[in-house]
């Protein structure tokens, strides 16, 4: 199963780097759209999320939110499920 992960970011955002670090740790591939590099990305993000802050993270087309929401999903063990993975055994 391929999971579609989309991040709207800027290159200076520490929360964006934090979210990407977690995804990298989990060996997740993502598509990244810099909202400052292309104004169309900013518009698309605002329309899809209703928000103007970054990062905005989508998994399989569903808005997750920002880095805090991404980490909260991970702490609850729900991120692995969204990514189509079996959570680690406890």
Indicate residue ranges for each PLM-predicted region.
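Structural signal for short hydrophobic segments within the conserved structured cores
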Residues: 31-33, 62
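Non-catalytic, surface beta->alpha helical segment in thiol-disulfide oxidoreductase systems
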Residues: 59-89
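Thioredoxin-like thiol-disulfide oxidoreductase module
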Residues: 34-52, 78, 82-85
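Terminal leader/tail segments of proteins
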Residues: 4, 89-90
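Structural micro-motif
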Residues: 49-58, 68
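Local sequence-structure signature of Cys/Sec-based thiol-disulfide redox active-site neighborhoods
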Residues: 1-29
């Amino acid at each position: 199963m391929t999971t579609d992960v989309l991040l709207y970011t800027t290159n200076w955002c520490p929360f964006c780097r934090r979210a990407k670090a977690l995804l990298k740790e989990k060996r997740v591939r993502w598509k990244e759209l810099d909202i400052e590099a292309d104004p169309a990305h900013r518009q698309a993000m605002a329309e899809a999320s209703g928000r103007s802050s970054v990062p905005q993270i989508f998994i399989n087309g569903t808005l997750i939110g920002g880095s805090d929401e991404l980490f909260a999903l991970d702490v609850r063990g729900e991120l692995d499920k969204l990514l189509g993975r079996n959570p680690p055994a406890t």
